[in-house]
Amino acid sequence: EKLDWMNGHYLRRMDVDKLADCLYQYWSDYPPEELDRIPSIDETKEIVILIQDRIKTLKDAAPFIAFLFKDKIVYTATQLIQKGLDLEDTKNILNQAVSLLNNIDDFWEDNIEESLRTFAKENNIKLGHFLGSVRFAITAQDASPQLFKSIEILGKDLTLFRLDQAIQTLNS
């Protein structure tokens, strides 16, 4: 435990580019089974900022970002429905998210965050319900690295595809 803490402390203080290089080399030498493909060095540099404060070892990184490098994510309709919501609430939230994200021309973190937060606030939707539903639909995880940056990295097309996939799952 002490060694994990020390290693985590070292990784958190490491230069982002150096950590990205270490991760890229580690994944190249020991491909994680969680990833359908190994991220490029440029992709690795982009995701390091999402996970640097969460990992204790290089091996810890892949589970946090697996959703970014999976061809398909799998879940059931029951898993998509957040606590405190029902089927219709979840469908409405995901449909609204599709509409909001589809209308963002400059698809980057700040615009994504502003659009989703503003909509939830103006429509008196609990932010946790709204963002939790979106998070699970695109990551198949209850917790993930920074949601808005993750959406930016996934890209508009893949994000919208995953939201549509979640809506189809709820409709079946």
Give the predicted meaning of each segment.
Residues 1-28, 32, 150-157, 161-172:
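Non-catalytic terminal extensions that flank enzyme cores
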Residues 4-7, 100, 118, 147:
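Preference for short coil/turn "hinge" residues that link or interrupt alpha-helices
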Residues 1-4, 17, 45, 49, ...:
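Non-catalytic, well-ordered alpha-helical scaffold segments
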Residues 1-9, 53-56, 125, 136-141:
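Core structural elements
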Residues 110-170:
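Charged substrate- and nucleic-acid-binding regions of tRNA-handling and nucleotidyl-transfer enzymes
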Residues 12-16, 59, 140-146:
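Short helix-capping/linker segments at secondary-structure and domain boundaries
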Residues 16-123:
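Small-residue-rich helix-loop
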